[in-house]
């Protein structure tokens, strides 16, 4: 084991070379967010290898509820790092469709107090989200879709698979946006050794190490990767789930959904995603289904594709996938209306089934 002194002697030169002040601007710009809509709730959930421990956190979330005639409810799961604000561009479109939007945050984000060191495996994350959804009494809504972006995508898939085994959950679908593939992607594959080393430092919970490590991680995420984080502590928490991806195990969840015709799913990705290679995303899309796959290069393509996707869902197809050729890692920002239309079409398809019954 390395001593703290040995670690610090190797980390300090990195700080010196990085010039942590470079790239930050003193000029503040207006930032559109959903923070004025935040609500707070305490969430108690199971954690640990065998879920034998209990953790309680204070969790902030956003709940945008139509005044009447709610068509359905969609719960969003952010990436790592990520927050409820990752889905802010969808708000107005969901409101127009009378769809209730609940944007959640995971332990480790700036909007959850507690659970930092024991809530980063998929088992922990799914346990937390299930408990949060129970606390918000989402078993009582009419229709429910779980939507995840990036790291949250595989959690959306797993949760939908898991909770749909219980008929008390009104689940009708899952939406995955820029979600990881079945193997380590370029965002982590070339850095896995470094990631594992950094995680070993984070897990020491050493104040001296953290005082040096957190500024480095804050700079790394904001200036080199381009993922916005508020603090080095948040950046450190965001790295922990990088070690616990499901990857190939996602196939088990997809296979499970395939056996549940009442559950529909959409998987969308961008060819120019700077974290995930196109061929890896395409592999996931084709595993869902080689049919009902759309290649979208512009807004006109998107308009045609959403009409066809809606038709596919309403005629009984389970899975729809789309490759946005000119887009990157944030489809919920560049094509928010398209994704909202997908959610709306899944709700409509389920409504038609109910009407026929």
From Swiss-Prot:
Gene3D superfamilies: alpha/beta hydrolase. Pfam families: DUF1057. InterPro entries: AB_hydrolase_fold, DUF1057. It comes from Caenorhabditis elegans. Keywords: Hydrolase. Signal peptide: none annotated. One of its GO terms (molecular function) is hydrolase activity. It comes from the Eukaryota. This is Uncharacterized protein F35H12.5.
